[in-house]
Amino acid sequence: MANTPSAKKAARKIERRTAVNRARRSRVRTYLRKLEDALTAGNKDAAVAAFKAAEPEIMRAVTKGVLHKNTASRKVSRLAARVRKISA
């Protein structure tokens, strides 16, 4: 438990940031889940639309510090390859 006033304030701030980051991470996972569902269903149009919606959301998570840049790029690259494969 925090003892000093500054440590107590820092703990409160961390709690707030954690809640925000948890919501952002959940939002990204939701977009990824929708894309995954479209890919497994084999629905080309839905997969393309879901990918176009998911990519900016993933990259936004990078700018907000939720995901590492390389992790996001790897995810986008692999998802794009899967979408291209289903579109061909």
Swiss-Prot record:
Transmembrane segments: none annotated. GO terms for cellular component: cytosol; small ribosomal subunit. It comes from the Bacteria. InterPro entries: Ribosomal_bS20, Ribosomal_bS20_sf. One of its GO terms (molecular function) is structural constituent of ribosome. Coiled coil: none annotated. Gene3D superfamilies: Ribosomal protein S20 (1.20.58.110). Keywords: Ribonucleoprotein, Ribosomal protein, RNA-binding, rRNA-binding. Residues 1-25 are annotated as: Disordered. One of its GO terms (biological process) is translation. Binds directly to 16S ribosomal RNA. Belongs to the bacterial ribosomal protein bS20 family. HAMAP family: Ribosomal_bS20 (MF_00500). This is Small ribosomal subunit protein bS20. The lineage of its organism: Bacteria, Pseudomonadati, Pseudomonadota, Alphaproteobacteria, Hyphomicrobiales.
